[in-house]
A protein has these predicted regions:
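Charged, amphipathic alpha-helical segments
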Residues: 1-12
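Acidic, low-complexity, intrinsically disordered interaction modules
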Residues: 18-79
Length: 80
């Protein structure tokens, strides 16, 4: 996955009023981790990811942390 692909996924989710799920590798952990970003935070989180991760989406301070997937979701907790 590239920064361009990540940006496209985030912008499509924003247009469709969906939330975003980002899948990452974490050091010392055999399985991946999923982070959910709500639609209201999409622009802010995308800006953070673009600043904090390199062109191949490895974390700038720890390359063992890597974004490997992102996709739009409809995340509902109840209430507002």
């Amino acid at each position: 996955m590239t920064k361009r692909q990540l940006t496209n996924i985030f912008m499509e989710a924003k247009r469709n009023k969906c939330d975003i799920c980002v899948e990452l590798t974490i050091p010392g952990q055999d399985d991946t981790e999923f982070i959910i970003n709500k639609n209201k935070s999409i622009e802010n989180k995308l800006e953070y990811y673009l600043k904090t991760y390199d062109s191949k989406l490895g974390h700038c301070r720890n390359n063992d942390i890597r974004i490997i997937n992102a996709f739009a979701i409809d995340f509902y907790l109840g209430g507002d």
